[in-house]
């Protein structure tokens, strides 16, 4: 069973709202960089970057972050053909003394964000990391909290939340898949 909880128009309105929140929170955008966690987080980061530029005239430096080697669940993969493939980060971005806007699609246990923060240290010591999450579904295992949330969606552990993006899925929407 599938239920669409955010359609295309609401998806883009959510991008716009989060972009406004980022601009409003910071007196200046000069020391901000935006980093999207591959794959869907990176596409959401790209949408945010474009919208912030439309609203402020400032093009934030950005990067796609691959966290493959920083994950703590690789030992749980029992088949070699199921192992994730490292595709690298899109470019090197010096985050030293910058405020990093870290972007991902779904916040669940918090483990992906922990891995992303570990990966970010390879690019310098950020002054601050702020977290943008498109959908927060709860069920945290680590003390991770988002600074900007598109939508809070209470779920059961059996449900799956899918954030769908144009490049990955051919559309912008969010669905809950249940049993």
UniProtKB/Swiss-Prot annotation:
Record's catalysed reaction(s): UMP + diphosphate = 5-phospho-alpha-D-ribose 1-diphosphate + uracil
Keywords: Glycosyltransferase, Transcription, Transcription regulation, Transferase
GO terms classed as biological process: regulation of DNA-templated transcription
This enzyme's EC code(s): 2.4.2.9
GO MF annotation, one: uracil phosphoribosyltransferase activity
SUPFAM superfamilies membership: PRTase-like (SSF53271)
Motif (PRPP-binding): 100-112
Pfam families in alphabetical order: Pribosyltran
Family in the record: Belongs to the purine/pyrimidine phosphoribosyltransferase family. PyrR subfamily.
Function, as annotated: Regulates the transcription of the pyrimidine nucleotide (pyr) operon in response to exogenous pyrimidines. Also displays a weak uracil phosphoribosyltransferase activity which is not physiologically significant.
Name of the protein in its database record: Bifunctional protein PyrR
């Amino acid at each position: 069973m599938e239920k669409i909880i955010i359609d295309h128009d609401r998806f883009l309105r959510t991008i716009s709202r989060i972009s406004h929140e980022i601009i409003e929170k910071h007196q200046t955008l000069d020391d901000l960089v935006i980093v999207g966690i591959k794959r869907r987080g990176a596409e959401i980061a790209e949408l945010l970057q474009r919208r912030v530029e439309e609203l402020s005239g400032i093009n934030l430096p950005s990067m796609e972050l691959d966290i493959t080697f920083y994950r703590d669940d690789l030992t749980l993969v029992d088949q070699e053909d199921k192992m994730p493939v490292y595709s690298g980060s899109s470019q090197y971005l010096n985050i030293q003394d910058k405020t990093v806007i870290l972007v991902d699609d779904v916040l669940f246990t918090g483990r992906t964000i922990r891995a992303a923060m570990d990966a970010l240290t390879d690019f310098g010591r950020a002054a601050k990391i702020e977290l943008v999450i498109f959908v927060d579904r709860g069920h945290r295992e680590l003390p991770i909290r988002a600074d900007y949330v598109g939508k809070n969606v209470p779920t059961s552990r059996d449900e799956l939340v899918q954030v769908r993006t144009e490049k990955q899925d051919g559309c912008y929407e969010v669905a809950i898949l249940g049993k």
